[in-house]
Amino acid sequence: MGGISIWQLLIVAVIVVLLFGTKKLGSIGSDLGASIKGFKKAMSDDDAKQDKTSQDADFTAKSIADKQGEAKKEDAKSQDKEQV
């Protein structure tokens, strides 16, 4: 009563084929499949890239600000040594 029967689905499918044609439906299906494949590939590439960067090196990454801070500390130490 409330559900869609197999016959109603077949009638809808026949109407869709008559409206769009088999060539158009085939191209839509292949385009949809290609886009899904590209999406899955992009998702797996992101995961692989993230794993590679997180396990790439044994040392901790330092930012430019950290390097500049260390350089200032070394300059201050060398100036202190010169003053003594």
UniProtKB/Swiss-Prot annotation:
Recorded topology in the membrane: Single-pass membrane protein
The keyword Membrane is annotated on this UniProt entry: yes
Cellular compartment(s): Cell inner membrane
Molecular-function GO terms, alphabetical: protein transmembrane transporter activity
GO biological process, one term: protein transport by the Tat complex
Keywords: Cell inner membrane, Cell membrane, Membrane, Protein transport, Translocation, Transmembrane, Transmembrane helix, Transport
Transmembrane segments: 1-21
Quaternary structure and interacting proteins, as annotated: The Tat system comprises two distinct complexes: a TatABC complex, containing multiple copies of TatA, TatB and TatC subunits, and a separate TatA complex, containing only TatA subunits. Substrates initially bind to the TatABC complex, which probably triggers association of the separate TatA complex to form the active translocon.
Family, similarity comment: Belongs to the TatA/E family.
Name assigned to this protein: Sec-independent protein translocase protein TatA
Organism: Salmonella typhimurium (strain LT2 / SGSC1412 / ATCC 700720)
